[in-house]
């Protein structure tokens, strides 16, 4: 099953504002792996890079300055994800989310495919603060020649 999540679009405003970006509705949902990835790109579309960065697990998060700079020319992003792979063992839940991303930048647009790997300590096993929600441990994306509507990354849990 493939779900499509479309984010920022552009609208024209007459007279005083020649153009402006329509702001995507706010989404911060850490209840499932695919919703964490959707929330990441929602934050990117809204240019809320600190929030986008917060979806990464603290020990594996990229440097915030470099992360923010990586999106300097990004105008909007569309996300599709494939079937999530999940497993639970020894008190930890692990997930792999295949994705296709269309990024529109000041230089044009490009399609990327890849995989995000996420994990969470079983919520019932967490007894000391702070609570640790599902977090992105890693993500690998590669530019693709496949059109966004048919592109999709591949994943495993390794």
Q: Which stretches of residues belong to each language-model region?
A:
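Positively charged n-region of N-terminal signal peptides that target proteins for export
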Residues: 1-4
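Bacterial N-terminal signal peptides
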Residues: 6-14
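Sec/Tat signal peptide C-region and signal peptidase I cleavage site
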Residues: 16-20
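Short solvent-exposed beta->alpha transition segments
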Residues: 23-24, 28, 34-39, 49-94
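Exposed beta-sheet edge and beta->alpha loop/turn motif
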Residues: 90-158
């Amino acid at each position: 099953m493939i779900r499509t999540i479309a984010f920022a679009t552009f609208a024209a405003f007459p007279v005083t504002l020649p153009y402006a970006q329509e702001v995507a509705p706010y989404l911060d949902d850490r209840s499932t792996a695919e919703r964490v990835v959707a929330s990441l790109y929602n934050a990117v579309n809204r240019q809320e890079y600190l929030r986008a960065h917060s979806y990464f697990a603290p020990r594996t998060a990229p440097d915030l300055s470099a992360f923010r700079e990586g999106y300097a020319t990004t105008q909007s992003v569309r996300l599709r994800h494939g079937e999530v792979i999940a497993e639970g063992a020894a008190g930890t839940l692990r997930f792999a989310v295949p994705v296709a991303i269309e990024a529109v930048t000041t230089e044009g647009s490009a399609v990327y495919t890849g995989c995000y790997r996420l994990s969470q300590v079983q919520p019932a096993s967490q007894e000391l603060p702070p609570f640790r929600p599902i977090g992105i441990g890693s993500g690998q994306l590669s530019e693709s020649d496949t059109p966004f509507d048919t592109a999709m990354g591949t994943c495993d849990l390794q």
